[in-house]
Amino acid sequence: MTPDATRTDECRATGAASTSATAISDQAGAKASAENFPVALRFLPRRYRGHLAAVYGFARSADDMGDEAAAGERLDLLDELEADLGRLYRMISWADVPDVARGEGSTGGALGSVDGGIPSGGDPGSRNAGGSSGGHPGAVDPGGSPPRLAVVRALAPAVVACAIPAQPFHDLIAANRQDQVVSRYPTYRDLLDYCRLSANPVGRIVLHIFGAATPEREALSDQVCTALQLAEHWQDVAEDLRAGRIYLPLEDMDRFGCTERDLAAPGAAPRVRALIAFEERRARELLDAGAPIVGMLRGAARAAVAGYVGGGRAALAAIAASGHDVLRATPRPGKARVAMELVRAYATGR
């Protein structure tokens, strides 16, 4: 995003924005403790649940700042969240990071490079990038202040123990910034680029938490996460339209002869159903392409990722079962179907 030259650092750090950011941060943290991310993860060992809950709290906070705050405050709040993320990474020293978390002395689950944080020039999707993070846990700023927001402070144990790079968190913030200025996607490629920011970072963070991040696994994870994001978009077409957003690629709407007025109808016309069926099949193919990641993992990591894959398949099955009418009611899978798909993915490794 292009920085707004008229918005100064002083404006971004106003007390009003700070108060709102703190309130949203606290609420997101409470949601992370009370909700399922996803349901299957409640059965994981406590150390993993804590790290995943912290990541979920951060992601929810970014989403809430981008969706639920007053429209005129959203970019300021996201700036503050990113600045606080920068404080977190500046205060962490490599001396705090266990050898195994740095990929040293591990077997079969090395994290690989933890480089990849925001470079000193900033992320193209970022307006201020929260300061230089040094690229990974270990960049030291002895004179820096600690994070102010609860959801950012809660990330510290996971970032240190699992050597999670900064970039995925910055990408999640960039996705929410994009939501403030982009409400339509001309092409499918444009939508995939958005998913690269809004969905794929979560999978990469999860792999780091389980000590399982490798380039091959990250590539497969990206396919799974993009498919999950697409499934959610197709479930929520009506809700997104009420919020002023359409994630269906405009080129696909044109191909099937659909208009925005069609999407505002109480039920889906045949041409809309055909469009959703096309998008559902494409998301399913993407999910199936990434699903072999399950077979590359063991133990808790395998169970967690099987939960994501199974949940995605159940969501897509619900869309199909609705006759691809996502306008009359939001299609949601039942718990039994989710559990069945999880077990199947875990057992087959895909």
Show where each model-derived region lies.
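Catalytic cores of Mg2+-dependent Asp-rich isoprenoid enzymes
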Residues: 1-109, 141-229, 234, 238-350
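Small-residue-biased low-complexity repeat regions
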Residues: 20, 105-113, 117-144
